């Protein structure tokens, strides 16, 4: 199954900015690895939450469209809320 998500570059950093994103139904994330610099991004929570129930989400290459540019990544780490069915943060590694 091929996964493709739209993402935006995140400019606001820190705990307060991340909490505001989560309150608005978005997830803060980061893309790192390769020769490029790490990029902080924001993704839609519902799209990722629906996709992460598939086993292939964790092993297949995922395409992120970051401001019009496609980047191939794999899930490196995912943080979940302790008791709510919500995602808190995702780390992606360039494939």
From Swiss-Prot:
Any one GO MF annotation of this record: structural constituent of ribosome
Family annotation (HAMAP family): Ribosomal_bL25
Organism expressing this protein natively: Actinobacillus succinogenes (strain ATCC 55618 / DSM 22257 / CCUG 43843 / 130Z)
GO terms for biological process, alphabetical: translation
Keyword Chaperone: no
Function: This is one of the proteins that binds to the 5S RNA in the ribosome where it forms part of the central protuberance.
Annotated keywords: Ribonucleoprotein, Ribosomal protein, RNA-binding, rRNA-binding
Protein name according to UniProt: Large ribosomal subunit protein bL25
């Amino acid at each position: 199954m091929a996964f493709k998500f739209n993402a935006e570059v995140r400019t606001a950093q820190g705990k307060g900015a991340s909490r505001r994103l989560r309150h608005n139904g978005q997830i803060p994330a980061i893309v790192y690895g390769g020769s490029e610099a790490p990029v902080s991004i924001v993704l839609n929570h519902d799209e990722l939450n629906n996709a992460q129930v598939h086993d292939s989400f964790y092993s297949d290459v995922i395409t992120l469209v970051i401001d019009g540019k496609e980047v191939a990544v794999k899930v490196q780490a995912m943080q979940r809320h302790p008791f709510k069915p919500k995602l808190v943060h995702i780390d992606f590694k360039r494939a």
